[in-house]
Amino acid sequence: MPLIRTPRTLPRVLSPGEVDALAGALRTHRDRAMVAAMLLGGLRRCEVLGLRLEDVNTGERRLFLAEGKGGRQRVVPVSGRFFASLGAYLEHERPATAATTRVFVVLKGARRGAPLSASGVDEIFDGARARAGLVRATCHQLRHTCFTRLREAGMALEAIQAQAGHASIDSTRIYLHLANDWLEKEYLRAAEAIEAQAAGPADGAMQ
């Protein structure tokens, strides 16, 4: 008896307006750097929190991710906007007295200088969502938004797999389904080429 495949729920992708609203609601360079790491680099929340100062290669604009999912390590490029926010955070906000090598730390209160926790990131997102008037905007949605936009821009699926840290390319293929605008443009471009080839020189001419 054949198995019935259960449809997989596609992860939600943030619209450009939602991204702008969320970015505008962030209050610190630290928070902007964390969001940029997820939105522009596709990092998971745990990978952002696991970053250490020695993992940051500013000259080559790369990050070494030592604490990826499943224990897999990788080096990924991230855009200059992330490094600009990161530089501002390290120069102006990160306490010089912080005893940890973790990049992202608590900025205020009794735990000032201690590594930022997952619950701390969630609290930051809750506040930013409320100020932006958004119902949903999660760390994982930022990651999915990153890879969807990269695919729409023409990035090869194998390259996205490497950037995302997926063990199997099957996990990456979901971005073929998410990139609806990209798919439509690719189809229309190909269809127009086929139609042009199929049309004869006298096609549509008066007989």
Could you say what each language-model-derived stretch is?
Residues 190-207:
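C-terminal secondary-structure termini that scaffold catalytic or DNA-interacting sites
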Residues 7, 12, 16-45, 70-72, ...:
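Basic, Lys/Arg- and aromatic-enriched nucleic-acid-binding interface segment
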Residues 37-39, 86-89, 103-105, 125, ...:
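Short, structured motif recognition centered on aromatic/hydrophobic residues
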Residues 76, 122-162:
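Short, basic (Lys/Arg/His-rich) helix/loop patches that form interaction surfaces
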Residues 13, 67, 164, 169-189:
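Catalytic-site neighborhood detector that most strongly recognizes the C-terminal catalytic loop/helix
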Residues 32-46, 62-64, 148-149, 191:
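Short pre-functional
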Residues 80-134, 200:
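Active-site/catalytic core of tyrosine-dependent DNA strand-transfer enzymes
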Residues 46, 50-85, 99, 170:
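Conserved tyrosine-mediated DNA breakage-rejoining catalytic core shared by Y-recombinases
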